[in-house]
């Protein structure tokens, strides 16, 4: 026999064992093997149960801590043209190594593009200057490094600050410029310290105020509403130090924090200010002027259209007094003062909350819609990987898939982080990049991977779905499924790239040549008209250049004669002035002589009267 019994049979030196003894020993051995397998199986079950309980305990703890975060859904509306521009801008920054992880944000890049009217080269130059300025100024650590102890004195001579939010959830910033005393302000602080304080407050807004408003309003917010009270503003407010401060602050804000103003209301503006504004308005960009509203003394109704009465200070026509906090200008009232919201912000609630991303076309219609569970999913984080099973459905209209199959959403807090050395399904799509857009699957029409393939390829550290076996005997099956999913991912990636390349190379539809032909004709007509005007301009310049640079002889003679005539007139004027002066002097002398004669005659009359009386 060649079975396991023969291998484990005990050799007998006394002779050949009988068949009964062999059967008895065989049955004893089989019983011991069954017992050993039973014990091993029970140990495996206990180990698996213990591991499962441990994982579930971790999941429960994380769910308890994230219960508030997961309940917040933030709406993020994006325009498809802006989306494409930001994606192109992001790729340019990545190629130039100008995109730190901290600033890899869709809305931040969009603000810089808007500031440069979507000129990518100008926006890239502006972005590079901003990165360099942050390094030189120490902006990344200014909140921890800089302490502004004189803030109370500064607020006394320069009343300003945030107070609550408008009806759309944006923070409201108020300045009472008429109460500013620049001289006393510069006595309690310095220009450089105030500028550092200003930058610190801007950084605090992006770290606390804007995220808190985002959570409270349940939509993305990165701009504010400003109210400037110019009552009493005069030349005394615009000293040299004040002008220098305003110039430096405007440069810092415009260069490094662009497009953070949603709208501005200038109230208590007098007739002179409004006349000046109507003149200055013609030199500004129409988009900028549309944000600025100059109001007179009857501004209350306009402000109440934007801000609720309970959120507007009493001195601006609202009902809020903040009496228990020293007044509205000192209260710093807003969602950023809510302990629950602040706790969520400090624990990354604004970044880890569910984001509802809507992509709109030029007509304002939703063409793509996605609800990523958590923006950041780390492959090595068990608790965050758990959220992958909670991902909500993604809906894309057929029209959007047909028209925008090449569109890719740039990662904006909705990315899957793939750790080095980890096997991840999402990681196969971007081996060159650490972050993979989660929404690309919703917009890309070539995404054909079945849900079962996704569910069978969990990343490292992620919990297994219920349909995946967890016992030891299914290990080979899991390895096979993971390998198949990996291969499918690679094939899908290459098919996506090839489809995009083919899409770009496909000939346009039949109606496209007509459109392109008309556009080309219009461009040709425009070019011809420009060339014609340019030719006329060159002819005029040539005619001007052909004229002699010296003055003609006749005109020069006339000019000399005019100069001589002016000289003669000046001489005559001098002589006339001299004669007039002499005449005046003669007149004074005559008047004095007449006065003397009158006095003499008066004395003679008095003497005659006296003699007659005697």
Curated annotation (Swiss-Prot):
Region Disordered, residue ranges: 19-42
**What topology does the record note for this protein and the membrane?**
Peripheral membrane protein
Q: Which Gene3D superfamilies match?
A: CRAL-TRIO lipid binding domain, N-terminal domain of phosphatidylinositol transfer protein sec14p
Q: Name one GO cellular component term.
A: plasma membrane
Coiled-coil ranges per the record? 519-576
Recorded hits in PROSITE patterns, A to Z, give: CRAL_TRIO
Q: Could you tell me which cysteines form disulfide bridges? A: none
Q: Known InterPro entries for this protein? A: CRAL-TRIO_dom (IPR001251), CRAL-TRIO_dom_sf (IPR036865), CRAL/TRIO_N_dom (IPR011074), CRAL/TRIO_N_dom_sf (IPR036273), PI/PC_transfer (IPR051026)
A Pfam family reported for this protein in Swiss-Prot or TrEMBL: CRAL_TRIO
The UniProt family comment states: Belongs to the SFH family.
What the protein does?
Required for transport of secretory proteins from the Golgi complex. Catalyzes the transfer of phosphatidylinositol and phosphatidylcholine between membranes in vitro.
What is the protein name given in its UniProt record?
A: Phosphatidylinositol/phosphatidylcholine transfer protein SFH6
Q: Which organism is it from?
A: Arabidopsis thaliana (Mouse-ear cress)
